[in-house]
Amino acid sequence: MKALHFGAGNIGRGFIGKLLADAGIQLTFADVNQVVLDALNARHSYQVHVVGENEQVDTVSGVNAVSSIGDDVVDLIAHVDLITTAVGPVVLERIAPAIAKGLVKRKAQGVDAPLNIIACENMVRGTTQLKGHVMNALADGDKAWVEQHVGFVDSAVDRIVPPSASATNDPLEVTVETFSEWIVDKTQFKGALPNIPGMELTDNLMAFVERKLFTLNTGHAITAYLGKLAGHQTIRDAILDESIRAVVKGAMEESGAVLIKRYGFDADKHAAYIQKILGRFENPYLKDDVERVGRQPLRKLSAGDRLIKPLLGTLEYGLPHVNLVKGIAAAMHFRSDEDPQAQELAALITEKGPQAALAQISGLDANSDVVAEAVNAYNATK
């Protein structure tokens, strides 16, 4: 089996690329970073530091790399069996034209073997969004062939891969936590379902997408925002602060009540899942910076993301949300010289006041009780 993976960054190398290579799949990375491409093609291998209670160093070998903006990547798309991505949500649109060209070439060469594409991004139904961009780049005459032969498979991914300062200045070395989860929608594949260790197949993907978004992402963000306010440097420092931990755990329990109501998750198993995530935040080997985790607060405060979406669920089912509201208030306080969205957020609050600013960012009704609760919490944490 041959696979092409867009994005040779830390998540690409440390998570998805590693799983594919470990499964014996012939893997080629596509990226724009020439230093990384040259290193991969010189060595065809790299090291992954898996950190947790039992630290280990794994070597990923037998890999190649091509530029994601040249003809080589188009040629590869015409022949591979699987395409995966870990490029970040905003970059999906940029790689779509190359994928479209490759699919046209595949059709022209008479390659009718099924191809599956899986976007492994921190977003809801990212592959469906990528499909839209690819279809926009195709001529009408090619769309029916693509619909018939190409599966666009949505997935949920979960592994903390912080930027790590390599002691050896090796551009390929990467550090990851022990935990990883890659869940894919088995109803969207074309052809036979792949058997890749570490890839879980489900016919109920949205339950797992929201479980991860409402628990890991919600908890991670609130830990970062409260941690920043309290002067902590890392996620570990923040979650070991009992006052922060109580709010984070409470928020995950509130969002969890929504999941249990919506999808029928087992309450005891979900409580154990929350405990596991709190343990991941405590990992002493991950130097996970609160500023990194908190960045892009406008996106994280938008209607479909990790703070407002679970809050909307609590409103839908008439459930408590006091800790989620505290997290939202802390997000509104996020300031960072490195992050344009943090600066935009600050300017918006200065210009419009917290009530109108939150309503604009989140889509919540400015006159609703929950916005008033958030504004009160915001003012209380000044």
UniProtKB/Swiss-Prot annotation:
One Gene Ontology biological process: mannitol catabolic process
Family of the protein in this entry: Belongs to the mannitol dehydrogenase family.
Binding annotation for NAD(+): A3, L4, H5, F6, G7, A8, G9, N10, I11, G12, R13, G14
Catalytic activity: D-mannitol 1-phosphate + NAD(+) = beta-D-fructose 6-phosphate + NADH + H(+)
Source organism: Salmonella typhimurium (strain LT2 / SGSC1412 / ATCC 700720)
Protein name: Mannitol-1-phosphate 5-dehydrogenase
Pfam family, one: Mannitol_dh_C
UniProt GO cellular component terms: cytosol
Keyword line: NAD, Oxidoreductase
E.C. no: 1.1.1.17
PROSITE patterns assigned: MANNITOL_DHGENASE
Enzyme class per UniProt: oxidoreductase
Gene Ontology molecular-function annotations: mannitol-1-phosphate 5-dehydrogenase activity
HAMAP family associated with the record: Mannitol_dehydrog (MF_00196)
Keyword NAD belongs to the record: yes
Residues annotated as transmembrane: none
Underlying gene: mtlD
